[in-house]
């Protein structure tokens, strides 16, 4: 699973996923990409599931770029613990994805294969996504 090697603070503040993405909203590496149509927190397990779905559909051909990384630690208090007594322990890691962010890019396979691989990856994510081709993103 993806997670940072080390962080400055163990329990960070929540980061909002409202609004549009400021950076990484154009295709840079691949020919096809998966773009977020809404904002959300994407967990490291969801990113890994999408990556596996893409590489299996592509039969290990081509190249995949993952442009999101789970930097944000989500905390959780144990079951049946009363309110208060500080913030909970880090539980999982999430990537903050805003609308318009390019999450995955693919290169080196046919258009039909790329679209099917990205469609399957989109089913693993908790948000609406759009498949775009280089030069057609906007």
From Swiss-Prot:
It comes from Acholeplasma laidlawii (strain PG-8A). Belongs to the universal ribosomal protein uL16 family. GO terms for cellular component: cytosolic large ribosomal subunit. SUPFAM superfamilies: Ribosomal protein L16p/L10e. Disulfide bonds: none annotated. This is Large ribosomal subunit protein uL16. PANTHER family: 50S/60S RIBOSOMAL PROTEIN L16, LARGE RIBOSOMAL SUBUNIT PROTEIN UL16M. CDD domains: Ribosomal_L16_L10e. The keyword tRNA-binding applies. GO terms for molecular function: rRNA binding; structural constituent of ribosome; tRNA binding. Binds 23S rRNA and is also seen to make contacts with the A and possibly P site tRNAs. One of its GO terms (biological process) is translation. InterPro entries: Ribosomal_uL16, Ribosomal_uL16_bact-type, Ribosomal_uL16_CS, Ribosomal_uL16_dom, Ribosomal_uL16_sf. It comes from the Bacteria. Gene3D superfamilies: Ribosomal protein L10e/L16. Keywords: Ribonucleoprotein, Ribosomal protein, RNA-binding, rRNA-binding, tRNA-binding. Part of the 50S ribosomal subunit.
């Amino acid at each position: 699973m993806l997670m940072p090697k080390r962080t400055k603070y163990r329990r960070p503040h929540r980061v909002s996923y409202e609004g549009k993405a400021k950076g990484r909203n154009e295709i840079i590496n691949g020919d096809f990409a998966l773009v977020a149509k809404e904002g959300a927190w994407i967990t490291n397990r969801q990113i890994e599931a999408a990556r596996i779905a893409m590489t299996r559909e592509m039969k290990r051909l081509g190249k995949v770029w993952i442009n999101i990384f789970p930097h944000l630690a989500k905390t959780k208090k144990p079951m049946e613990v009363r309110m208060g007594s500080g913030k909970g322990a880090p539980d999982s890691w999430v990537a903050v994805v805003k609308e318009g962010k390019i999450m995955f890019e693919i290169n080196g396979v046919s258009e039909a294969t790329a679209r099917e691989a990205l469609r399957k990856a989109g089913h693993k994510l908790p948000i609406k996504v759009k498949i775009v081709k280089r030069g057609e993103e906007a």
